[in-house]
């Protein structure tokens, strides 16, 4: 029998000299011979291992053999180390683990091959005979030593017995078999040792499927199906590996021929183009040669090609239910869906070889989960892959013909945003590259502490975008191969010995693509001066993305003199307040004075905080609409709380009103805050700092910087609106409309029926919104056209150009599409909203009479402006009439007037009930000005809709309503609360429920409707339909609150809840896990919420804080739904900018502004 002891007791790492020095890996001084204490991890099948690499057997067994005792003795010398440094933070590590590396890498003395994709040193060639026993034995014993050294408690007898058993097995059979636990240990260690993997922090969580007993390709397929089902896990991806039988003589291999278990086909078309994934062209043709029938689509999943026991391969179609795919969409660009992109959720590498203890497993498919850039950069943007970069750039309106415009960078970022958004929307596991890089740095530090090294390939670990703004970029790394290890293999079809020559694929000449031969390292090292600057944290919370945009603009401003960091509130740790120097907050207010969704967590933690020891400086800017009574409420709450905690306010809080020039207000506040910060921080050279042009742009109008040129391009309204607003705009046509109010009412509420016969691909869910792009009134447009000077013909298409910053050339302005001035004023420009301060200041330049110019300048002051705006609420035409000496050019209008925004309406129909129609419920808005003495003003969209004739086009798009949708479980009870046009989405709810009952056999749970209006004979919208739904059992209860019944007290929806439904509401919410929906005016929603909280607090004996937490949980569980809108009538806005309570605060408002 061969002697194993010379391999077991080899202690080659004792050969180096030792000197006393600081242990940099653990950052503490240690006495000579001290070893790091091991970390523990979960045990593998009832026995625990160290996180450490193999250590000597511990001294827990008495009377060890002398030679074995030497193995455990404290080493008299410390291994030589390689020092590696992180150039970002200065931290250094000492790598000693590389002394256990196996073999040499690809580098030569005069040339580095580190950028070679598949170097020979990382590739295992096929064998035609078994590994000789004298080569296998030392590797086997070394692995057994490694395995038993990983236990927390030594198992000396078991260890020695296993060594003898392996030795005897090799001597008898020429090979040996791993135990199940050894296989699990080996696969995890191989992942831990993989230098090109950035996600190794999860190495200990790998699920191992032992498939070494299978013998046929069909059995292999069944194992892989099990693997796919487990790993996909409905989107909650789990890392897993399936290990097929080990290699014997190289002639009976079990292999998966696919590069990945799931991959899309690539078809070489007759004209030389490629349809699908170009990376799969060769393999796809192989599948076709084996008998697979191609589908010739862009995203066809290729079959699995499996080889068992060295036999010719067989192919198997993967069942569609095992292929989880994610359709791509963008959170802002609706047109991104038109690209019709998708990607599979599971990245499962299938063609690598596992080497462990001299054994080779050529079939071992494994998976983790995606890092976003793998799809968004490599799969979608690489020129040799789907290569969508230029198309996306063009759709974004970027200058794709100029490299210096950085269009590629901007486009690739948005593609990656789309990938992350799409995966997250579908609840599929994915990690962004910044988080992945951060997690690797934590893993690397842990590895150096636990085992003195971490093999890492810098070229592979630095993400393909973001470069030096990821921490791995600045980290020196040492690359080497340990055992166990995952090796590359030569493609199976290139080396397979065919038994049936008729099945051998014909050899084809493969066209070689142009390969990228070098990796360009861009970006400078981080400037050392940043470390000496004052740190500034900028937090934002947002629902629409506007606060984030402004926060990042603020970061750009403060980066001129400070060290800013911009974070979303849900990414911020409250404990960091104790370390802040300067904190800036930019946030919107959502709903009824609440925080945006991504600010809820911080709000709750901050408001529970009692005190701060760090008295930092802060400033807050709030965004909102003064049409809401809780204008900028969340920003004010944060301001007051920080002040209460003892923080020092740097500048007064700022407010940005969506109805009154929020961008100008933000710029003024930002510059004021920046100057104050420079003063308090004593910034050197603060008077010479050049701040971004955004904050220094001239507020004056210079007509020489703009010009109009004739254009021959006809206007495509849908395409133009799609590009301007980043929406997928389509055309519906008016079918009919009827007034839902009775003849005795002096108000109008329309049921608008739109035909979607020309847009049959239209899809929406009950509760979602229809965004409508209206046209301005013809009288307003004509009145402005009559007062314009220096104008082309009203119907002549033109486009706008602006002078470059240096004044040397003209640049096409893409703010508006090529169109006539008449078209611009009708469809693209807002001519009804009162002009902002900034626009009035520019108009003052154009007044030819001194008195008018002086009056306009006075109106730029906030107090005068607010009084004038609230009294007159002037349209742009009325401004021209009030100041007749104004000489306004077409260039001024096209460049300075604000963009006309879409109006949103809840869809009042079910797609299943009316597949060819979309219904809206629209209150036609008419209101007086100048305290009733001025002209009547009309809502833009509601008036436009009311004037349409049958078959007139309506440009629109569908907007998701978030969580405002029917429960996924139809057995959950619902209470629907919607006065006035707040009934709109609930009509779609009851139509959908009626359809499900009739056609799907579903019996939904109790649905209770609480409606409110003035009188039953005046404005009870959809009254007959409600009665029908009640009689058919769709609505189990209908309660109506009438607020204008003669001789009776006013009753509102909250009164119904308090007086008639208190017990039912509590039972539904607290016991039956039901859903409650509120739709309508923000003041009504506030009163309803207050009533509900009072009822719950009284019934459950909760404190004010407890009941707030109770409703916070309801919203978190997506069981309390709100779809609310602000005040509609401008005269209801107070001078201080907040919406006031009208004489009847509960009068139903129009659903959807104007």
Swiss-Prot record:
The keyword Nuclease does not apply. A motif (DINNN-motif) lies at residues 23-27. One of its GO terms (cellular component) is cytosol. L-arginine binds at residues 260, 369-370, 374. One of its GO terms (biological process) is superoxide metabolic process. It is an enzyme of class 1 (oxidoreductase). InterPro entries: CysJ-like_FAD-binding (IPR003097), FAD-bd_FR_type (IPR017927), Flavdoxin-like (IPR001094), Flavodoxin/NO_synth (IPR008254), Flavoprot_Pyr_Nucl_cyt_Rdtase (IPR001709), Flavoprotein-like_sf (IPR029039), FNR_nucleotide-bd (IPR039261), NADPH_Cyt_P450_Rdtase_alpha (IPR023173). It is found in: Cytoplasm, Cytosol. Residues 536-674 form the Flavodoxin-like domain. Its cofactor is heme b; FAD; FMN; (6R)-L-erythro-5,6,7,8-tetrahydrobiopterin. Zn(2+) binds at residues 107, 112. Its EC number is 1.14.13.39. (6R)-L-erythro-5,6,7,8-tetrahydrobiopterin binds at residues 378, 459-460, 473. Its main location: cytoplasm. FMN binds at residues 542-544, 546-547, 588-589, 625, 632, 658. Binds 1 FAD. Binds 1 FMN. Residues 727-967 form the FAD-binding FR-type domain. It holds the Pfam family Flavodoxin_1. NADP(+) binds at residues 747, 981, 1014, 1043-1044, 1050, 1052, 1054, 1087. Homodimer. Interacts with NHERF1. Interacts with GAPDH; induced by oxidatively-modified low-densitity lipoprotein (LDL(ox)). Interacts with S100A8 and S100A9 to form the iNOS-S100A8/9 transnitrosylase complex. Interacts with SPSB1, SPSB2 and SPSB4. Interacts with ELOC and CUL5 in the presence of SPSB1 or SPSB2 or SPSB4. Forms a complex with ASL, ASS1 and HSP90AA1; the complex regulates cell-autonomous L-arginine synthesis and citrulline recycling while channeling extracellular L-arginine to nitric oxide synthesis pathway. Belongs to the NOS family. Produces nitric oxide (NO) which is a messenger molecule with diverse functions throughout the body. In macrophages, NO mediates tumoricidal and bactericidal actions. Also has nitrosylase activity and mediates cysteine S-nitrosylation of cytoplasmic target proteins such PTGS2/COX2. As component of the iNOS-S100A8/9 transnitrosylase complex involved in the selective inflammatory stimulus-dependent S-nitrosylation of GAPDH implicated in regulation of the GAIT complex activity and probably multiple targets including ANXA5, EZR, MSN and VIM. This is Nitric oxide synthase, inducible. The gene is NOS2.
